[in-house]
Amino acid sequence: MNLYNLVRDALRPSYATVSPSVDEPTVDNNFVALSCYATLSVLLYYLQRVKQPYLSMLFHILFCLSQVCMVIWLIFSANFYVSLFAQCMLVVCALGCFLERTILSIKLRSMAPFMSMADNFAIIKTTCNNYVFPVERSSDNLVVLTTSRGIYSNGVFMKGAITVSDNALVVSLFKSHSLLLDRVEHGYDYTVFIYINSVILQNIKPTVSVVNTEFTDVEL
């Protein structure tokens, strides 16, 4: 009897029990990628403003690469409208950057805007020629060093004449202003000219310990 039951159970078709399916939570890969891109872009945007020039250049290159990768990813998107928008955005940005550099080049009469991504440029006149230097961070501080080999401006060297006029013209895309240079040091074969904004040398908020108000303003 037991053998009969075993054979019968073996020949009987077995029906699999279907358990109620539970939907696993899915993560949208596009949302994760866009979140990482936004976080990385904001982080690199502020990191490229560090004072160390090599680190600033490195972060600036990484920031540009991240933007290029995002645009390429959007161009090859499966959505036709997203891809078309990315391609149009790429063309508009390229034309805008080229137009900005071209206008600066015409105003400066120099090809310096195509060699540097600076927003401000200083025109320094010498006895023989005019020299264009990029002003990376601020036009409020400008140091000019002339030697027998050439001229330095904020760390950028160019071969040229020694004698420099007492002013420099700082040109940007929408405005330009003249800076009066002061000769602070003179040696055998070098001269140092410097310009510092008067606001930097002024105590706007005097401390409590200052009693006499005559000493709140500091002049160069």
Swiss-Prot record:
Chief localisation class: host cell
InterPro entries (alphabetical): a/bCoV_VIROPORIN_3A-like_CD, a/bCoV_VIROPORIN_3A-like_TM
Lipid bilayer topology: Multi-pass membrane protein
Localization (cell): Host membrane
Keyword Transmembrane: yes
Phosphoprotein among keywords: no
Keywords: Host membrane, Membrane, Transmembrane, Transmembrane helix
Lineage: superkingdom: Viruses
Transmembrane intervals: 27-47, 56-76, 80-100
GO CC entries: host cell membrane; membrane
CoV 3a-like viroporin CD domain: residues covered: 120-200
Domain CoV 3a-like viroporin TM intervals: 17-116
Designated name of the protein: Non-structural protein 3
